Each structure stands twice: as C-alpha cells, then as structure tokens.
UniProtKB/Swiss-Prot annotation:
EC number(s) recorded for this UniProt protein: 4.2.3.4
Binding-site residues for Zn(2+), renumbered to this chain: 183, 243, 260
UniProt keyword annotation of Lyase present: yes
Protein encoded by which gene: aroB
Organism (species): Streptococcus pyogenes serotype M5 (strain Manfredo)
TM regions (residue ranges): none
Protein's recorded name: 3-dehydroquinate synthase
Length: 357
C-alpha cells in the first residue's frame, strides 16, 4: 500500500500519510516547525489511553495540551473560547501550530480553532477512530454545533497533513468501529460497489492488512470526490447520503441512543427506501444494504428513541444543505446518486417519512 496520498485543494494542498510510527511521521511533518509552540487538542478518552504518547510529545516539543470532555458537546463555541484563552495565555503566534489527536469531534473542533485564530494558523490532524480516518478528517470541513444544530458554524480549512495509523483502532470499541464502517459503506454504496462488497465480506478478526486496504480505498474515493468538488456544489453532495435524516436524529436524540455512524445508517436506509419507491434503486440493493448493516450491528430503524416524523421534518428545515424553499435528500440509484427536493411546506411528505421509519 502506498504511504502517501496527495490531495489537491483550491485552498491549500496537503498529504495524507499512512504510518504505524506516529511520532516519527509527526516529526517529519513538522520539519523546521519543531521549535515552534504546539497545542495538542484531544479528549479525555484518548488522553488516558495514550498518556505515554503525550508525555513523549512533551519531551520532544514545546508542547501544550488541551483536553476536552468526550462527545459532541465539545463541538461548541464555549469550548472554542476556552481553547482561544489557552492559546492567548501561552502567547501562540500565527506561526505556531495546532495538532488534533482524536475522533471527528476533536478534529472538527481543532480545525475550526485553527481556521479562526489569527485568521488561520497551521494544524495537523491525527484521527484516532475509523470514522474520522475515512471520513471527517478528509476534505477540510471544520466546524462546531450551535443551538442544537449540527455543524452550523464552520469553514473549509485544510490541514498541513493528516496522519493515519491503524494502531489507534486496536483500542476502539466495537460500536465505534461499526460507526466507521457505516461511512465506508456509504461511499461504497454510491461510488464503489466493489468496496461495498468487500466490506460486506470483511472479517476484522483475521484480516488486519485487509482493513488497511479498505481504509486506503475508502480514503482514495473521498479524495477523488473532494478534489473534483471541494465546495460541495455537485459530486461531493453525494457524500450526504443518509445525512439529512442522520443529522436530524443527532439533533433530537441523546448521543447514547445513536452515535453519528448509527444515525447515518438509519438515514441511508430511509434514503434507499425513498429511492426504491421512486423506481430509482432495485429492491435487491436495499436488501443488501439492510443485511450488511445487520452484520455490523448498525441500526436500521428509530426503535431506540421516541422521535416523531413531524419533529424530524422541523429539523430538516434548518439543514445547511437546503435550498431556499426545499429540503434536499441524496438518493442512491443503480448507477450513482440523484437529489430529491422536498418543499418545506409539503406536509404530505411527513406521512411518507413516518411510513419509512
């Protein structure tokens, strides 16, 4: 497997580096910046799992650490403000750097701070979950939640580099592993059916090298899409398959009920059911999606939480993917994807949605 993927960006090109030697790879990335100040942003879970790693960072660099509570509540302007306070207190300049080590929450949060402190300072992402490695770290999207609305405030601000190491996945709980698989299945179902089939048959316990290949293949797919449509005007919208409903579920439900990859799985099932009902997708493809979700213990219905179609529809109206008058869904087809625009006043769709949940 190649060790590097180079991503072309209209903002700034960057490399995705595959390694099992995080310290050495980070040192190589920093180069002459080794003498600059570094702020490592992480969460309590990662910090306690890899405390020795952070101690080594402290020995080698002029480093500071900001440790967030785990979970989506840290993607907030209050947490951003706390990190600003630390950067200012330690006299961080525009030439100093942030390094995020954690899952998607940490990466999005740290990237947003980097994008906005002094109008932009450099940062490196080290994603530690499968979901963040194959999805949220790739493409430059950074941001935080606001007043219960998912990723409402943010930007596209690419990192200097992304360091991918599967060694972090050895401590990942099965539930979080399945959430990452959910995003890999998403891109496979829309863009790479051979990848989808490989994921369907994959045996995690006996095929570590196979996992590395699947991660590389998933990232390569997303890299290709992002390079063609960085600002989500066309092709990149396909990566929102499952996300209109998924983000609404996340907004309405406690994190304990549905993690991100689980909410997206339910969203994909509903999008696929809509596609079947409109003759865009064979029923056999929907059945295949349901079977593979069951294999990875991903939910396909909203049975864990009492959420109504009406409340979901109300949240849809605030989705940033919408046009002025329409709610946008991404529907899979036999050969790719299409968009479905639902009028924000179409209350008949609420009944349709209720029948699909």
């Amino acid at each position: 497997m190649p060790q590097t993927l180079h991503v072309h960006s209209r903002v700034k090109d960057y490399d995705i580096l595959f390694t099992n030697h995080v310290l050495k790879t980070l040192a190589d990335c920093l180069g002459e910046r080794k003498q600059r100040k570094l702020l490592f942003i992480t969460d309590q879970t990662v910090y306690h799992l890899y405390q020795t790693l952070f101690e080594e960072f402290a020995q080698q660099y002029n480093a500071f650490v900001h440790v967030c509570p785990p979970g989506g509540q840290s993607k907030s302007l209050e947490r951003v403000s706390a990190i600003y306070d630390q950067l200012i207190a330690e006299n961080f300049s525009k030439k100093d750097m942030i390094v995020t080590i954690g899952g998607g929450v940490v990466g999005d949060l740290g990237g947003f701070v980097a994008a906005t402190y002094y109008r932009g300072i450099p940062y490196i992402q080290i994603p530690t979950t499968l979901l963040s490695q194959v999805d949220s770290s790739i493409g430059g999207k950074v941001g935080v939640h606001f007043k219960g609305l998912t990723n409402m405030i943010g930007s596209i601000y690419p990192p200097e580099a992304i360091i991918i190491s599967t060694t972090f996945l050895e401590t990942l709980p099965q539930r979080e592993f399945s959430c990452g698989i959910s995003e890999m299945l998403k891109i496979g179902f829309i863009h790479d059916r051979p990848l989808f089939q490989q994921l369907r048959d994959f045996q995690k316990e006996t095929d570590k090298q196979g996992l590395e290949r699947l991660i590389y293949q998933s990232i390569s797919n997303k890299k290709r899409i992002v390079e063609q449509d960085e600002f989500e005007n066309g092709l990149r919208m396909s990566l929102n398959f499952g996300h209109t409903l998924g983000h609404a579920i996340e907004s309405l439900c406690h994190h304990d009920f549905y993690h991100h990859g689980e909410a997206i799985a339910i969203g994909m099932v509903v999008d696929a059911k809509l596609a079947v009902s409109k003759g865009l997708l064979p029923k056999e493809d929907l059945d295949s999606l349901l079977q593979v979700f069951e294999r990875y213990q991903l939910p396909t219905t909203l049975e864990r939480a009492d959420v109504s179609a009406t409340s979901l529809f109300d949240v849809f109206k605030t989705d940033k993917k919408n046009s002025e008058q329409h709610i946008i869904f991404i529907l899979p087809t036999e050969t790719g994807f299409t968009t479905l625009a639902i009028n924000k006043d179409d209350h008949q769709f609420v009944e349709k949605l209720d029948s699909l949940l």
